[in-house]
Structures are given as C-alpha cells and as structure tokens.
Amino acid sequence: QQGIAPNVTLGMAAALSANGENNTGSETRVADAIRWCVFNFEADIISLSLGGAQDQSASREGPAVSATRQAVDAGIFVVAAAGNDGGSSDDGFVSAPGNVNLVITVGAADREGNVWSQSSMGESLDSDGNVRVYPNQKPELTAPGVDILSTGMDNQWYTSSGTSDATVFVAGALALILEAHPELKPNGQSTTACIELVKRALVDSMNSDTQHDSKQGYGQLKASAWLGQIPDEISC
C-alpha cells in the first residue's frame, strides 16, 4: 500500500497520552509537540489530527494556539481538524488550534460529499472578535472522513470516521503541492506570505465565488485543482 504523498519525510510527535479515554492530552503537551516540529524536526507541514474544546478565555488562546501561531509566523503550514462535536451538541466553534486564522481547518464528508453529521461548525468571529473573511473562514473545507479504511495494531485493518481522518488527506495533498513547488517551503526567512497564497489557491480551487458554509467551508478538497491554482512564478 502507498500513501497520498509517498516521498515525504514523516516525523511523529507524541502529543497525546494513551490513557483509555480516547487518547486525551494536555494543551501544554500539544504545544510542546508543535514546537518540536518547528525547532527540532524543522517541518514544512504540521498535521494536527486533534483539537481542544473552545473555551473563550482559555483554549482559544492557550499554549497550543500560541505554538501554532509561532509555526505559521515562521511560514510553516498547519493543517488541523475542525472537531467532532457537530449536531445538537455543536458549540459553534472549531477546535483549537484550528481556530488560528492561517491554519487550514478541515471538516469531514462522506463518499457522496455530504458533510458528516458530527463535523464541527465554524464561528464567524476570530479570537480577537474580528469577523472572519476570505480565505480564513472556518472550516476552510471538507475532505473524506467517514468510514476511512486504514492500518491498525497487530497487522489489522480498521475503519474510522472523523475530522482527524479528513485532516490527513488535506495534509497529503499539500505535501504534493510543496513537492511540485519547493519554493513555497519555509526557509528560515519565511513570513506568512506563502501560506496566504496557498490558502487563496485552495479556496479558488473549490469555489470561484468564495461563498462559505459554516460546516462545509468553501467546498470539498480537489487536490489537482488546488495544485492548478498555484501560479507558475511564485513571489512570496
């Protein structure tokens, strides 16, 4: 079997604890894992199949969010799960640190493209109280995230559903874009300009009129079209 982006160098950071409660973890530990990706592993993309509840006074600007801001400010792409609290229990917020403006935040959809019932709704305001605008409304998109077949323990196969599953599809597609356009990768002197360019290309690849839905985002992942929206000559 071959994954979406077989040529990547994959780094794994233990951000959660296997404690019998769905691998929960502290924000501090998640923040430490993100900073390891930034400073030790020197990642181009950080894929976060995790998230915390949106406490207006804590999680939205807690350690994990601060570490994520540090990553994107350095030009590192961050892709994060929108969260799985959709339906009647939806609090109206994507999970942290997916609430950070320049993060690509991913909801889940089924094989027919229908938004998964548990995929979290996005909020209209950012953490500073400003109205979110193109291309940073949350979530930005949906990707396959229902009954996803993958490998498990002891040479077993298993299926799972959630925005965490959807996140890795987007991270893989983004890895292929950086492979085709290595000039987009962070280089130690990077700003957020390349992230902004790639996010605009993402939205334009799905939705030419940039209409946004609070659960589906700007549309469904179209990896080839996303790549096609990246200009041949890049200045960022």
Predicted regions located by residue number:
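Secreted peptidase-domain scaffold signal
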Residues: 83, 223-236
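Subtilisin-like serine protease catalytic core
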Residues: 1-26, 41-44, 73, 99-103, ...
